[in-house]
Amino acid sequence: MDVAGITWPEAHLNPEMMANLAIASYENKCFENVGVPFCMTIEAEAMGSQVTMGSKIFEPHVTGYAFDSVKDWKKLHKLDLTKGRAKVVLDAIKIIKSKNLNAPIIGNITGPISVASSVIEPSNFYKSMRKDNKTVHEYMKFITEEIIEFANAQIEAGADTIVISDPSGTGEILGPKFFEEFVVKYINMLLDGIKDKNVGTIVHICGQMK
């Protein structure tokens, strides 16, 4: 950031700054790719959660959930890719693409469980997997469909690879039964939603995938 003269949180909100910071990270050999965005709150914020932009040191994070109960999921906003930080990301990818760099462009996506537990209060969300299983599946389907739209828009903007990070979707948190039922199912749905776009995909889940 200091070398580029571009810092957080400003780079989270401005497509030129986001693009140029990502490019600077590549050119200064911090990464072997050029990837945006720099946080995991874009999707949750677009669906109604409150997010603080953090600081030069700390990433943006959720400070208020859109709803407390999974029963309210039908009231959620759909992802509007024409405004807010979702648009900032898409515009940043277009800027990076226009530079014709000899590096893959990475579009970063937050995984279904992590988005779901950033939109609805996490402990209530996890409890609902057992108490209101059917509604959670309806909610997860909605969340995953919205993420697919965002991923495909990033590809259209110029992303070569989509990286899906789902740190809340671990076996340690959910247990093996719910990991299979809610993580594997909806990660696969997400991958199926972008598989015809002829781009690479990477899934990152903290912990053991079992």
Please annotate each region the language model reported.
Residues 1-55, 91, 95, 138, ...:
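N-terminal basic, low-complexity leaders that serve as flexible interaction/assembly modules and, when applicable
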Residues 21-24, 65-70, 135-140, 193-195:
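Short C-terminal domain-edge/linker segments immediately following a structured domain
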Residues 40-79, 95, 102:
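A contiguous, low-structure linker/loop signature
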